[in-house]
Structure formats: C-alpha cells, structure tokens
Amino acid sequence: MLKKLLLLNIGLFFIPSIYAAELNSGDTSWILTSTALVLFMTLPGLALFYGGLVRSKNVLSVLMQCFAIACLISVCWVVYGYSLAFKGDGLFIGNLSAAFLNGVSRDSLVGGVPETVFITFQMTFAIITPALVVGAFAERMKFGAMCLFSVVWFTLVYLPACHMVWGGGYLANIGVIDFAGGLVVHATCGIGALVI
C-alpha cells in the first residue's frame, strides 16, 4: 500500500503545469519586463521622436500630448477599458463586469501571471496606440481637442478592435491571431492617422 501511494505521489510530479492554476514566476517576470519596455517606447521614446520631428516651438506641446495621453488612457483603462476589451463574450465589445477592476484580486491569474500584471501589460498597448496617432496631428490640434479625441478614439476604435482580436471576440473566433499588435495597434492607429 505504501509503495502504491509513493508511486502515485511521484507520478503527480509529471503532470504538466498547464493543468495547475498556479503562478509562473518566469512568465510573470517576462511580462513585467515587456511592460516596462512597451511603456518606455511611449514615454520617453515616442514623445522624444515626435518632439524631434516638429518645429522647436512645438516640442514641449508634443511631449505634453504624449504624457497626457498616457495619463488619460491609464485612467480610462482602469475605469472601463480593461472590462470592455477582455471581459464578456460579445462579438464586438465586452461588458462592464470588471469596471473599476471589479472582481480583480491579487490572487486572480490569467495564463499563469497575476491578472494585475496582465492588466498593466495590456494597458501599455492601450497607451501607445493613441500616442502613435499624435504624429498625424502634431502642430495642428489644440491640447483640449487632442485629449477629447484620444479618449473617444480609444473607446470607439481601440477597445472594440482589442476585444475582437485579443479578447475572444469575432475576429478571434474566425481564427485571426495577432501576436504583436499588427492589427490592434498598428492598423487601427494607422487608419486613424490617415483619416485625420
């Protein structure tokens, strides 16, 4: 009996970690590193890049626009963005079940990483996407109009695209795979910049 119990316990060590809902420290550290890298692409990277493309009198304006977008979109992401992008099973948009990060605890996991880390990682993509559009209207839009445009564009364009591709919506259901944001980030902001 003791041998059978010992063999059973040894066999349990070979069960793949996929079946266990536990924290993966390697994945978590990589996602945290990636989060910092994507955030540095926006602030200071994109801000300084756009600052170098405009006339010297508008450098501070472009830097402030990128910084303001980072602040505004961070707040919008926590209030309703994460919920609309990744919660619910709608084809085009999620639901508000996790508005204000309701139901997110320090113990909740998404794919082996803490959900708070996943939320922060996805927030960096939500920040950089409207910041990329700044290049289309640099030196041409007032600050208040830019803030309003960024929040409206984030809500009406980015969130549905994010949900449809990464959040299990329509495009994910038909097999679209977007690993690095080619559709969700670059196509949406490119088309948005073209329309402006």
Task: Outline where the language-model segments fall.
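Hydrophobic alpha-helical transmembrane bundles of multi-pass membrane proteins
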Residues: L2-I196
